[in-house]
Amino acid sequence: MHESSALSKLYNWDCSVVFIILNIYTTMLVLVTTGGTVPFEALIELVLSHESITTLSQLGFSKMRVQYGRGNRHIFTKHHKEGVMSITGFEYTDDLAGEMSRAHLVISHAGTGSVLDALRIGKHPVVVVNSKLMDNHQIEIAEELFRKRHLLVSGDTDSVGFIKALKMHREYLFETLPDPEEGILQRIIEETVSFM
């Protein structure tokens, strides 16, 4: 028996009410954070590409929220297309951790602050590195956190690596980020900086 029919008979509800309830509880949300101040247009293009949207939809996601950064709405609008997912965007929020906690998947630029925000609330983001940044320390930190199984790194804005990371995410065996008092983050940063 179909789940909605069983619920309808059990609670004597109209089927349309059951479908609304099932939709509320089965909606899977992707949050994309591209950074608040430095635009990462290539990441916006990547997540809003037909291939990415199709893959996310096939993985069961139906909603996406894109934090595109202060003053960069035109970038989001330029690449946003109506389709199989409900997609909304916003410049900035004082509660990015709250946005992340509501998401089933976080896709993030490799900025240490955003990555750590996600890890601290128990999310394991798919991280995309902006290789165009000068003196890019982000890749070293992201790769170290990947080696420790805290997140997935798709590399630069390469769609093949990104799609592979999206597909791996659900089945990947992540490790939880240790508590800050254990000093792992400080060690990672010190080790990374010492190699520069």
Swiss-Prot record:
Q: Does the keyword Endoplasmic reticulum apply?
A: yes
GO cellular component annotations of the record: endoplasmic reticulum
Q: Would you say which domain of life the source belongs to? A: Eukaryota
Q: What does this protein do?
A: Involved in protein N-glycosylation. Essential for the second step of the dolichol-linked oligosaccharide pathway.
Q: Which family does it belong to?
A: Belongs to the glycosyltransferase 28 family.
Q: Chief location of this protein?
A: endoplasmic reticulum
Specify the protein name: UDP-N-acetylglucosamine transferase subunit ALG13
From the UniProt record, list the reaction(s) this protein catalyses. Answer: an N-acetyl-alpha-D-glucosaminyl-diphospho-di-trans,poly-cis-dolichol + UDP-N-acetyl-alpha-D-glucosamine = an N,N'-diacetylchitobiosyl-diphospho-di-trans,poly-cis-dolichol + UDP + H(+)
Which residue ranges does UniProt annotate as crossing the membrane? none
Compartments in which it is found: Endoplasmic reticulum
Q: GO: which molecular function terms?
A: N-acetylglucosaminyldiphosphodolichol N-acetylglucosaminyltransferase activity
Keywords assigned: Endoplasmic reticulum, Glycosyltransferase, Transferase
Q: What Pfam families does its record include?
A: Glyco_tran_28_C
Gene Ontology biological process: dolichol-linked oligosaccharide biosynthetic process
Quote the EC number: 2.4.1.141
Assembly, in brief, is: Heterodimer with ALG14 to form a functional enzyme.
Organism this protein belongs to: Yarrowia lipolytica (strain CLIB 122 / E 150) (Yeast)
Q: Which PANTHER family does the record cross-reference, listed alphabetically? A: GLYCOSYL TRANSFERASE-RELATED, N-ACETYLGLUCOSAMINYLDIPHOSPHODOLICHOL N-ACETYLGLUCOSAMINYLTRANSFERASE
The UniProt entry, under SUPFAM superfamilies, shows: UDP-Glycosyltransferase/glycogen phosphorylase
The reply on keyword Cytoplasm is no
